[in-house]
Regions:
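Acidic, metal-coordinating catalytic cores used for nucleic-acid/nucleotide bond scission
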Residues: 34-37, 57-67
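Activity-critical C-terminal alpha-helical subdomain
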Residues: 85-132, 139-142
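Acidic, glycine-rich catalytic loops of TOPRIM or P-loop NTPase phosphate-binding modules used
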Residues: 6-7, 13-17, 21-51
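C-terminal, charge/polar-rich interaction regions
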Residues: 116-119, 123, 128-195
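Short beta-strand scaffold positions
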Residues: 10-11, 58
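Phosphate- and other anionic-substrate recognition elements at nucleic-acid/protein interfaces
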Residues: 44, 62-65, 69-76, 112, ...
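Conserved nucleotide-binding/hydrolysis micro-motifs of P-loop NTPases
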Residues: 14-15, 61-63, 88-90
Length: 195
C-alpha cells in the first residue's frame, strides 16, 4: 500500500473502493454530479485541500471533466493536483454495458496505471522524492511547437495526448499543466519529433 500525503477526490464509491485497495490516503467522493448541489461536500473539499492538498482523480470521459472543472473553479489552484487516466476502451466488470463514451473509468484501471497517474500528478508519496512542477513550458511554447493557435494544432495535440496516454477531453491549459509535470521543453520537443 502506497502512502500519499494529499487527499484524493473521486467521482463515486466504486472509484473510492478501487483506490482504497492501492493507496493509503483520505479518499473523498463527489457522488458524481451531486457535487454541484452539495454545498457541504464542496466546503469539506475546500477545507481538506487547504490542510493537506487535494488530488482530483476523475474519469477520462466528458462527465469526469465537467466534475473536474467544477472543482477547479471552486478551489484555489495552489491546493490542487490533477491525476489523469488514459483513454482505454472497455467496461468495468460490474457493468453490463460500457459507459456512454465506451471508456474505462478510474475503477477499471490497473494498480500500476493508477499509481503512475498519481506520480505524474505530483502526489507526495511517502519514501519517494517529491515531484515538482518546473513551469518550464509556456503557452507561447505550445504555439511555437504547433500545439496551439495554428491550423492543425488541435489534431497535433490529440496525437500527443494519445501518445502520452492522456485523456482526449483535456483543454490546452490542462495539457500544459500535465506537460509541465512530465517534461521540460527539450523533452517535449523530443516527444513531438516521434509523432
Amino acid at each position: 500500500m502506497v502512502k500519499i500525503k494529499e487527499a484524493i477526490v473521486v467521482e463515486g464509491r466504486y472509484d473510492k473502493n478501487t483506490l482504497s485497495q492501492i493507496v493509503d490516503a483520505p479518499i473523498l467522493e463527489t457522488s458524481g454530479f451531486g457535487i454541484f448541489k452539495d454545498k457541504q461536500q464542496l466546503k469539506l473539499l475546500r477545507k481538506v485541500a487547504a490542510l493537506r492538498g487535494l488530488i482530483v482523480f476523475t474519469d477520462a470521459d466528458g462527465a469526469g471533466f465537467v466534475i473536474r472543472n467544477h472543482i477547479r473553479s471552486a478551489i484555489p489552484g495552489k491546493y490542487l493536483k490533477h491525476a489523469y487516466i488514459p483513454d482505454i476502451p472497455g467496461k468495468e466488470k460490474r457493468k453490463a454495458a460500457p459507459g456512454k463514451e465506451g471508456k474505462l473509468g478510474v475503477e477499471g484501471m490497473t494498480p500500476d496505471i493508477i499509481l503512475q497517474a498519481l506520480r505524474n500528478a505530483g502526489a507526495t508519496i511517502e519514501g519517494e522524492t517529491e515531484k515538482r512542477t518546473t513551469g518550464a513550458i509556456t503557452k507561447a511554447d505550445l504555439m511555437t511547437l504547433g500545439l496551439a493557435g495554428i491550423p492543425g494544432s488541435e489534431e497535433k495535440r490529440k496525437k500527443l495526448m494519445k501518445k502520452l496516454d492522456l485523456p482526449e477531453h483535456m483543454s490546452p491549459n490542462a495539457l500544459l499543466q500535465a506537460l509541465n509535470l512530465l517534461y521540460d521543453l527539450d523533452g517535449l520537443a523530443e516527444v513531438l519529433e516521434e509523432l
